[in-house]
A protein has these predicted regions:
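Non-cysteine beta-strand/loop elements that form the S-adenosyl-L-methionine
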Residues: 78-80, 176, 326-332
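Active-site oxyanion-binding pockets that recognize sulfate/phosphate
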Residues: 4, 8, 28, 32, ...
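Hydrophobic face of alpha-helices
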Residues: 8, 19-22, 39-43, 102, ...
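Acidic/His- and Gly-rich active-site-bordering loop/insert found
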Residues: 3-119
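Metal-dependent amide/peptide-bond hydrolase catalytic core
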Residues: 197-395
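Histidine/acidic-residue-rich, glycine-tolerant segments that coordinate divalent metal ions
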Residues: 62-68, 84-92, 96-97, 103-105, ...
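Hydrophobic/aromatic beta-strand patches that form the interior of the parallel beta-sheet core
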Residues: 77, 124, 149-151, 324-328
Length: 395
């Protein structure tokens, strides 16, 4: 029996355990940085399978690493396991599938590969992908320094191995004015909400004229307490995105200019902060895409080389600039991510098929990269041969 057949057999043997873990995570969604129960479930699984589990970052208590050394030396294949859910929507991004797939891919791979083969299997539990960019902090703490390749799957509404992500920076824009009675002393006030609304209109309404590949969107989080009191404080949170980091940085500069203009025109003061690290565009690896395309076909998912017109952002993209990384998409639903329908489907038949296929695909790819040094060298060579403008991580 060849290796992939043994991996498929191992996935089938653990089918009930795989689905049960995903359902438990799906049933108790936890927000960014609060993934205590989910982290505990993944940790317990890997400890029970004789992985060595330790903290990955003191700053991120729900993160951890789980390691099994097959033999001395050799490459380290890292599976990332995302855990957090979305406010009000639960697992509408399918992190129950991502976390379960990463953990069980390592378990299956350990059961199939012979100890003594040079190399290490690792799971890195990564919190706060949805809000907080947890992997950026893990990068800063050196969590990926020993990884030779990083593998993760993502459920979606289509199949593709082509990794695309927009760079994103989050801006919190606060305006400070002066309170006054809105009817009795309107000229005594400085309306912070007026400033925020003026800024939002100036920055958002021309969005159809933004440079191709850039986006600006956000929400008003605070805007006053009563209609007869001129608000002295207003706050909005905005995402600025671009398909190239230079475009993103130019748009951020323009957004800042619009905020300062709005403050000047209303007599208010403005403060603009970035509450967390930004995320980058994705550095593709064509050799990893080739490996995964073959495995997609093996699981009955043909033509997985689609390039998307619209796509979002992820902190895994930052990882792709320091180590060869891939995040292929597996169709789990006919609905887009970040919707109630997708949250439902993440624990339905489509989501569970994506999960089982994902465990197989991750484990089979990891097996090849551990057992075929020449293949891993091709992956590294593709990483080193990035176009000149991609030689270093974007600022």
């Amino acid at each position: 029996m060849d290796r992939n057949a043994r991996i498929a057999q191992a996935v089938e043997r653990r089918r009930a355990d795989i689905l049960a873990l995903s359902r438990r995570i799906h049933g108790t969604p936890e927000l960014a940085f609060e993934e205590v129960r989910t982290s505990g479930l993944l940790r317990s699984l890997l400890e029970s399978e004789s992985f060595e589990v330790s903290a990955a970052s003191e700053a991120l208590p729900t993160s951890f690493r789980a390691v099994h050394a097959l033999g001395p030396g050799g490459p380290r294949v890292t599976f990332t396991a995302e855990m957090d859910a979305l406010p009000g929507l639960g697992h509408a991004c399918g992190h129950n599938i991502i976390g379960t797939a990463g953990a069980f891919a390592a378990v299956v791979l350990k059961s199939v590969l012979t100890d003594g083969l040079p190399g290490t299997i690792e799971v890195l539990a990564t919190p706060a992908e949805e809000r907080g960019s947890g992997k950026v902090r893990l990068i800063q703490d050196g969590a990926f320094e020993r990884s030779d390749v990083v593998l993760q799957i993502h459920p979606h509404m289509l199949d593709t191995v082509v990794c695309q992500a927009l760079g994103r920076r989050t801006l919190v824009v606060e305006f400070f004015g002066r309170k006054a009675h809105a009817a009795a002393a309107p000229r005594e006030g400085r309306n912070a909400l007026d400033a925020l609304v003026l800024f939002y209109h100036a920055a958002a309404l021309p969005r159809t004229k933004l440079a191709p590949g850039t986006l600006f969107h956000g929400v008003i989080e605070a805007g006053g307490e009563a209609p007869n009191i001129i608000p002295d404080y207003a706050r909005g949170r905005f995402s600025v995105r671009g398909d190239a980091m230079a475009k993103l940085d130019r748009l951020v500069d323009e957004v800042r200019r619009q905020a300062n203009r709005a403050a000047a025109e209303t007599g208010c003061r403005v403060e603009i902060t970035e509450p967390g690290p930004g995320v980058t565009t994705f550095r593709r690896n064509r050799v990893l895409e080739e490996i995964f395309a073959g495995l997609f076909a093996e699981r009955g998912r043909p033509e997985p080389a689609k390039v998307r017109e619209f796509y979002g952002s992820t902190d895994l993209a930052n990882v792709s600039w320091i180590v060869p990384t891939i995040e292929p998409l597996l169709k789990a639903s006919d609905s887009p991510i970040h919707t109630e329908d997708f949250a439902r489907d993440a624990a339905g038949p489509g989501g569970e098929k994506a999960l089982l296929d994902g465990v197989f695909i991750l484990a089979a790819a990891g097996a090849r990269l551990l057992a075929e040094p020449a293949l891993l060298e091709r992956v590294r060579a593709d990483f080193r041969a990035a176009p000149a403008e991609e030689k270093s991580p974007p600022a």
